[in-house]
Design a protein with these regions (language model features):
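Short, structured segments at the rim of ligand-binding sites
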Residues: 1-174
């Protein structure tokens, strides 16, 4: 952060044939504290790991929980996840501590309306679904084929390498 120059302050000019550079006198800079929350998409991997690893209990502190980014939490809770949101703070972005405990997950039929708010977390949801009881159905996720890489194909390959039984479709996985 810097103080804007006062119009009365003198400017020093350096000129050559093509360019002019204006240099203002020394200015005061002020420090400030900035609290940068943890990224929810990055936290999602730890959330799912805690859910599926026996006897796990972790708290992820100061994670951004903007409602447009946390659809995965709603889906996991619907699957039976033991997740608690604590210490909610209203900053520039809403943040909270997320407590996760090992849980027995159940399969779901994912509502396609949730896909736009889950697009970055779908690969980790596939992993959670592999540990759920029953058959999870995910459709409407064709956008994953056009991201930086074909994430549906990559996840299909990864799930196959792990021995997970699934069926891949152009817009999702069962």
């Amino acid at each position: 952060l810097r103080k804007e120059p006062d119009e009365s302050e003198e400017q020093e000019e350096i000129e050559d044939e093509k360019k002019t550079i204006k240099i203002f006198p020394s200015q005061e800079f002020y420090s400030t504290n900035i609290d940068i929350p943890g990224d929810f998409s990055s936290a999602s991997f730890l959330i799912v790991a805690a859910l599926i690893i026996p006897n796990s209990e972790i708290t992820l502190k100061n994670i951004g929980i903007n409602p447009s980014r946390t659809a995965l939490l709603k889906v996991l809770v619907e699957m039976g996840a033991n997740i608690k949101i604590n210490n909610v703070k209203e900053n520039i972005e809403r943040t909270a501590d997320i407590l996760i405990k090992t849980s027995s997950l159940n399969a779901i039929v994912l509502d396609e309306k949730l896909i736009p708010n889950l697009i970055d977390e779908l690969p980790i949801l596939f992993i959670a679904s592999a540990f759920a009881k029953g058959k999870t159905i995910i459709r409407g996720a064709g956008e994953l084929r056009t991201k930086e890489s074909d994430r549906l194909e990559a996840m299909s390959n990864a799930l196959g390498n792990l021995g997970v039984k699934f069926q891949s479709y152009r817009d999702g996985i069962d």
